[in-house]
Amino acid sequence: MEEDTKEELIKLIKKTLKMQTIIKKWDDLSKEEVEKIFSLRSEVFIIEQECPYQDVDGRDAEADHLLLYENNILCAYTRIFPKNTYFKEASFGRTVVKKTHRGKGYGHTLVKESIKYLKNKKENPIKISAQSYLKKFYASHGFIPKGEEYLEDNIPHTAMFLTFS
């Protein structure tokens, strides 16, 4: 193997190992993974956003869980619901990126992977309850706001929909 080709292969392997996404059912998550998920969600939703509301809502067992790791550190997460579980439509939510890992595109990766996962399962349309300040972010992925803004845990939210063919 040529030295240049070998170097390119090594760089590709390092890049591939750096970020990893995994989707698991609730029952397939280890205790350590569940602890890391709840810790990340609490860190952002309760502490950072100063939202003193219960994060654990009894819906995690109904969801599939998308975990994004960088160098074996859980740095981003979302949970994905098939239709007729959280909403009539398929959905994903509790989308979170660790503060120290923002600006790397991980939020976009979570949304793209969630859409891809639901699309592969023929789940259409997708409805999300987006924090209103993130409307442009979700619109960049094709989501369209519908209805009036509402409060969820005292934070302004907007229902947004994505339909694909």
Residue ranges and their predicted role:
Residues 1-17:
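N-terminal amphipathic/basic-hydrophobic helices that include classical n-h-c signal peptides
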Residues 82-92, 102, 124, 152-157:
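A conserved beta-turn-beta hairpin within the catalytic core of GNAT-like acetyltransferases
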Residues 97, 103-116:
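Conserved acetyl-CoA-binding loop-helix of GNAT-fold acetyltransferases
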